[in-house]
């Protein structure tokens, strides 16, 4: 190899090193997804979202109307619209569904039979709603740290999720504020579903 070619090769390698070290540019922006978070009052929606945002638990106040939180993850930002779960609020939930790309449904796995039945009815309505039925769902069986908590298998059977959600993208996960790692993993799985739906839309 001639001296000229050797010099050119070294110059090109120097250029590549320079590009790698000095010209990286800003990191690519994380994708953002707009989600709606629903569930009965007392299910723990606000506390779970506040934990993910590293907010002090002392400042947590139950949501009466709606609130929006930007929940950051390494590979995405979730803009979560949390809706209050009181009786007089739930009838207005559907007004806030438009534009959602995914759904988080939080239930109290240690609740009374009456409340659990109400939660089941609300989840069934959400799964079948025209604006939500094609979206990924993350269903969180919260308060697993309580003695009366029902298992994920019990929740799945009682809520009739297998037949009702067949063909849909959904995840049912246990959670509690005592196990933040499992909570974060649940949201990571939801992000994977959101990304899959994005990729399918691009291919179409």
Swiss-Prot record:
Entry keyword set: GTP-binding, Nucleotide-binding
UniProt GO molecular function: GTP binding; GTPase activity
Record Pfam families: Arf
SUPFAM superfamilies: P-loop containing nucleoside triphosphate hydrolases
Entry keyword Nucleotide-binding: yes
Superkingdom as given in the UniProt entry: Eukaryota
Residues annotated to bind GTP: 39-46, 82-86, 142-145
Alphabetized Gene3D superfamilies for the sequence: P-loop containing nucleotide triphosphate hydrolases
Disulfide bonds, paired cysteine numbers: none
Family, as annotated: Belongs to the small GTPase superfamily. Arf family.
Protein name per Swiss-Prot or TrEMBL: ADP-ribosylation factor-like protein 15
Gene field: Arl15
């Amino acid at each position: 190899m001639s001296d000229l070619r050797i010099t050119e090769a070294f110059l090109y390698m120097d250029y590549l090193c320079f590009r790698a070290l000095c010209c990286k540019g800003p990191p690519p922006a994380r994708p953002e997804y707009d989600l709606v978070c629903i569930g009965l009052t007392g299910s723990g929606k606000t506390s779970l979202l506040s934990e993910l945002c590293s907010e002090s638990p002392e400042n947590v106040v139950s949501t009466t109307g709606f609130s929006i939180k930007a929940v950051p993850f390494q590979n995405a930002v979730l803009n979560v619209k949390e809706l209050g779960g009181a009786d007089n609020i739930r009838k207005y939930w559907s007004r806030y569904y438009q534009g959602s790309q995914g759904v988080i449904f939080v239930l109290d796995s240690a609740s009374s039979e009456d409340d659990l039945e109400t939660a089941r009815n609300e989840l069934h309505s959400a799964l079948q709603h025209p604006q939500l039925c094609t979206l990924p769902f993350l269903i969180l069986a919260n308060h697993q740290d309580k003695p009366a908590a029902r298992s994920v298998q019990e929740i799945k059977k009682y809520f009739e999720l297998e037949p009702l959600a067949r063909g849909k993208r959904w995840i049912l996960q246990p959670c509690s504020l005592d196990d933040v790692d499992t909570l974060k993993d649940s949201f990571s799985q939801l992000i994977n579903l959101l990304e899959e739906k994005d990729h399918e839309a691009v291919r179409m």
